[in-house]
Design a protein with these regions (language model features):
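ABC-family P-loop ATPase nucleotide-binding domain
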Residues: 1-27, 261
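C-terminal boundary and immediately downstream tail of ABC-type ATPase nucleotide-binding domains
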Residues: 2-5, 229, 236, 240-261
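ABC family nucleotide-binding domain
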Residues: 16-239
């Protein structure tokens, strides 16, 4: 990736014992389809976990259960030691603590870029308007779209819109950021500008769960790669270990199909 320093991929491969997100024996069905099967996953504060796997493996569903966009049938999920609330104001607070960046940006089309980034601060965090605007402008500068603040989303490129979506999530001061295939809807030339922002967040210590097909990002930014197939976690390893010496046949098969060089 241009402009991004690539490490050996290990970083702090052994994160601290301070678990921020814990999924324990989580199961989820869509009708007869068992999309998450006995999932156990612990994510430490400051850890970057990249979830990869073939289509239909349950990656996005796993990501969406962490802020209860998808409910689970059994098992438990805790954030910072507390179980996920089911509904109401507590759920709104949880979602403020868990930033979510979607494939499709999900910006409000009728609000300016600045208003999009201010909205959650005003409505959920009850931040003073002047302070919310100051923070929003600083975050837009940070992700490289400060000059676009007064435009509407439709006036921006896909890459710019996704960077606004990242700024909007950061504006809430989240404890963890979830990225559900954040670059898969982008034109190829826009992918790097989003990955560079994500790489910067990772280097600054943001706790991140990233569902992606971008193997370069997984190699350079992840502390841990989680490989899923058929609703199960098949393998977990540091990027170096996973890409150079995958243990499972399923992972070997997956990598042989996507790594063309």
């Amino acid at each position: 990736m241009s402009g991004v320093s690539v490490t050996d991929g290990t970083q702090d491969a052994a994160p601290t014992a301070d678990s921020l997100v814990v999924l324990s024996n989580v199961n989820k069905h869509f009708g007869a389809l068992h999309v998450l099967q006995d999932i156990d996953l612990s994510i430490a504060r400051g850890e970057v976990v990249v979830v990869i796997g073939p289509s239909g493996s349950g990656k996005s569903t796993l990501c969406r259960t962490i802020n209860r966009l998808e409910t689970i049938d059994s098992g438990t999920i805790t954030l910072d030691g507390r179980p996920l609330p089911a509904e109401g104001k507590e759920l709104a607070r949880l979602r403020a603590d868990v930033g979510m960046v979607f494939q499709s940006f999900n910006l409000f089309a009728h609000k300016t870029v600045l208003e999009n980034v201010m909205l959650g601060q005003l409505k959920v965090r009850k931040t003073d308007r002047a302070a919310a605007e100051e923070k929003a402008r600083a975050l837009l500068d940070r992700v490289g779209v400060g000059t676009q603040a007064d435009k509407y989303p439709a006036q921006l490129s896909g890459g710019q819109q996704q960077r606004v979506a990242i700024a909007r999530a950061l504006a809430m001061g989240p404890k963890v950021m979830l990225f559900d295939e954040p670059t898969s809807a982008l034109d190829p030339e826009m992918i790097n500008e989003v990955l560079e922002v994500m790489q910067q967040l990772a280097s600054e210590g943001m706790t991140m769960v990233v569902v992606t097909h971008e193997m370069g990002f997984a190699r350079s930014a992840a502390n841990r790669v989680v490989f899923m197939a058929d609703g199960k976690i098949v393998e977990e390893a540091t990027p170096d270990q996973f890409f150079s010496n995958p243990r499972s046949d399923r992972a070997k098969d997956f990598l042989s199909k996507i790594l063309h060089h």
